From Swiss-Prot:
Residues at the active site: H117
Organism: Rhodovulum sulfidophilum (Rhodobacter sulfidophilus)
Family to which the UniProt record says this protein belongs: Belongs to the NDK family.
PANTHER family with a match to the protein in the record: NUCLEOSIDE DIPHOSPHATE KINASE (PTHR46161), NUCLEOSIDE DIPHOSPHATE KINASE DDB_G0292928-RELATED (PTHR46161:SF3)
Assembly with partners or alone: Homotetramer.
GO BP annotations listed: CTP biosynthetic process; GTP biosynthetic process; UTP biosynthetic process
GO terms, molecular function: ATP binding; metal ion binding; nucleoside diphosphate kinase activity
Pfam entry (one): NDK
Protein name per Swiss-Prot or TrEMBL: Nucleoside diphosphate kinase
UniProt xrefs under NCBIfam families: PRK00668.1
Length: 140
């Protein structure tokens, strides 16, 4: 496998409960390096652009409201097969279905407040990274 980069968000439900360090520890324990990270507060308009792919879904407005409700932590992770590894560490979207030891099983409050977001493919990762980070911010 090749070294990849992927994008991750620590969502408002997790930042509000001061779980950034605990989540980062799980990511790093899985062999992922954090090569860029910043804490930001999205506007609803910024969340709407980022999640535009879900615009026609019934949860879209609620998702945008939630993502703009509190600060988030956006990150670029790097490692061997980083996209798949990050998704494995995150666990299933629904925390009730997530495997033991995953971020969502341990920290998520519900399917909506599920603590983390991660890119699902290489193209998506590149787009999501570019939305939040300039090339100068990516170190590693």
């Amino acid at each position: 496998m090749a070294i990849q980069r992927t994008f991750s968000i620590i969502k408002p439900d997790a930042t509000k409960r001061n779980l950034t360090g605990a989540i980062n520890a799980k990511l790093e324990a899985a062999g992922l390096r954090i090569v860029a990270q910043k804490r930001i507060h999205l506007s609803k308009a910024q969340a709407a652009v980022f999640y535009a792919v879900h615009k026609e879904r019934p949860f879209y407005d609620e998702l945008c409201e939630f993502m703009a409700s509190e600060p988030i932590v956006v990150q670029v992770l790097e490692g061997e097969d980083a996209i798949a590894k990050n998704r494995e560490v995150m666990g299933a979207t629904n925390p009730a279905e997530a495997a033991e030891g995953t971020i969502r099983k341990e920290f998520a409050l519900s399917i909506g407040e599920n603590s983390v977001h991660g890119s699902d493919a290489e193209d998506t990762a590149k787009e999501e990274i570019a939305y939040f980070f300039s090339g100068l911010e990516l170190v590693g």
